[in-house]
Amino acid sequence: MPSVRGCNLPDDLLYDVDNHIWFQEQGDGTVKIGMTAVATAMAGKLVAFTPKRVGRSVRAGKSCGTLESGKWVGPAKSAAGGEVVVVNDDLVANPSIANDDPYEAGWLVILKPEDWDSVLPALVTGNDVTAPYEAKMDSEGFAGCE
C-alpha cells in the first residue's frame, strides 16, 4: 500500500487528489466514495456527516455530503455525478469512524454514476498516487498523518 508522509493510500482505489476523495468500483455499476486518510488527518476528529439522501442526485464536482470537525466544515465533492444509492448510516451515527478507518468502515456513500467512463481519466490510480499526493501536501503545507 502506498504511503505519503505516514498517510496510507490503498493501491486498489482511484483518487481525486485535489478533493481528497477516493473511489472504489463495486462491480455492479456503482462506486463507493470516501475521504482519504490525508483528508481526515487535516480535518481532525469528525463530529458530523450529513450525506445526500438515497435517491438524490449529485452533480459532478459537487457535494455528496457535508462533513464537520472541530476545525473545519465543508463538502465531500464527488468527481462523478449520479444518484446516491446507499448512505453509510454507521458514519452518520459515528462520524469519527472515518478518522479511524477511512477506507473500510468510514466510507461516505455509494453512487450510481451517470458517465463513469468520462470521469476515469481525471482520477489517479493507487499505484500512481504517491507523487501527486506529495505535491498536494506540499501545496497545502500539510506535514503528514503522523
Task: Please state what every model-predicted region is.
Residues 20, 55, 78-86:
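Generic structural motif
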Residues 25-28, 86-93:
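Short, conserved beta-turn/loop elements at beta-strand boundaries and strand-helix junctions
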Residues 79, 102-104:
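Ligand-binding loop in jelly-roll beta-barrel domains
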Residues 92-100:
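Short, solvent-exposed secondary-structure boundary/capping segments
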Residues 25, 69, 78:
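Conserved strand-loop elements at the edges of beta-sheets that form or border functional pockets
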Residues 40-41, 81-84, 90-91:
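Short, charged/polar surface micro-motifs in flexible loops or helix N-caps
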Residues 58-74, 99, 106-112:
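Short hydrophobic beta/alpha edge segments that flank linear recognition/processing sites
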Residues 1-60, 105-115, 122-130, 134-146:
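Acidic, low-complexity mobile loops and tails
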